Amino acid sequence: MVRLRFAPSPTGYLHIGGLRTALYNYLYAKQKGGKFLLRIEDTDRTRYVEGAIENLIHELKWAGVEVDEGVCLDENGKITEVGECGPYIQSERVEKGIYNKYAEELIERGYAYYCFCSKERLDDIKNQQKADGKIPRYDGLCRGVSIEDAKKRIANGESYVIRLKLPENRDIVFEDVIKGKITINTNDMDDQVLIKADGFPTYHFAVVVDDHLMGITHIVRGDEWISSTPKHIYLYEALGFEKPTFVHLPTVLNKSGKKLSMRNDDASVEDFRLKGYLPEALINYLALVGWSPESNEEILSLDEMVKQFSFDRVSKSGGVFDVDKLDWVNAQYIRKMEVSELAKLVKPYLVKAGFIKEDICEKRLELITKTFQESISRLPEIVEQSRFLFENVVVEPDALKMRNVEHIEILKEKMKEELSQIEEMDEETAKGFMKKVQKASGFKGKDLYMPVRALLTGQVHGPELSNILEILGKGEILRRLE
């Protein structure tokens, strides 16, 4: 059985690129009848952000990327774990001594060593190497310290880290599913720290141990990790672990061709949720940033993506995240929604704007929703588009001309006469109202509809006029005609 994982660090809110990584892991796992895990890699305690784990879980669930195993939230919103390979939070695994056991094994077998170099010495080496135009790397001073001497120094209270002992001048070769064959020589690599002075493992060590113990068969992650993969390959060999399949995904880029970043772009999943994007639309579009389905369809459900997904059709180069295209995809999903469901989603925006009350009649809310369903691409847009219904009309320049056509007074008079004949502007009355005005006034087409629309809405174009009449109602229409 294939087992894939999404293993973010809780250093901030879920990034749109992280969601795509999680999605690709999920799609492949589901297609192959496997499991999708969520593991939290919190070994860098200096960058830990309070609430980030909850955000990661919440946004994945909102997006429909459901976890089979690992970290989740219980019914009270508290962090919990499900599965037999836990703990799934690395800091909890540290407490169990999982990593130290394997680090000591590596030392005993000559694949790692204790390093006692101070931060000051390491900084001096780094600065000198930079000044000499060299790539900064550890100079190997402690490689020759025997295990016996090292343990004496540790017993005397010296601070230490554990480093990986790389062989010299050896090519490490691996096959990446997307990028192909990759070769990196150990002379271009560093003796990576495995266990830090605080006893916590580094990412590079913990990720190998955890992926092995959790039975992960495919490592699917961003291509920024390619340069680190040879270290991981060597660790798999040194520990006697079976190597998984590696899949490095192309970067998600902004329109300028640079990596989409939290600092310069709205790049958190929460940003898109709060801007009124539907989870189905965001997931649909995000899947297409770097992957092309065989069917060439642009609108795909999660189930359809599971059926069609293949790493063979993932691009080697970065995919551009185009917000305009996302808007188009989101609009397609809005158009397809049942009015009753869409009404529930737009209601909070209309209530917040003060346009409607919480206890609004369901039928009226659905009428308002239906009126703008074809024209909005994000949920909050309904506020600006419907503003003319609930506030004093702001007349556009083109509408001003229409409000001053020669026959405008005739139209006003005939509309008032027809209004006097009805008790209320219900759906049936609204649909027949303009036909009666047409017959009574003798005007039709643009000569009828554009001036009436200008009078009632301050615009010359807009949604179905019969819907507007029904929403405004008899009293408000009369007020606007005065």
Residue ranges with predicted function:
Residues 227, 239-395, 457-482:
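Catalytic adenosine-cofactor/nucleotide-binding cores of aminoacyl-tRNA synthetases and other
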Residues 105-248, 253-260, 268, 293, ...:
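Active-site cores that bind ATP or allylic diphosphates and position pyrophosphate for catalysis
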Residues 5-10, 37-42, 213-219, 434-435, ...:
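Glycine- and acidic
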Residues 399-428, 433-434:
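Long, amphipathic alpha-helical coiled-coil segments characteristic
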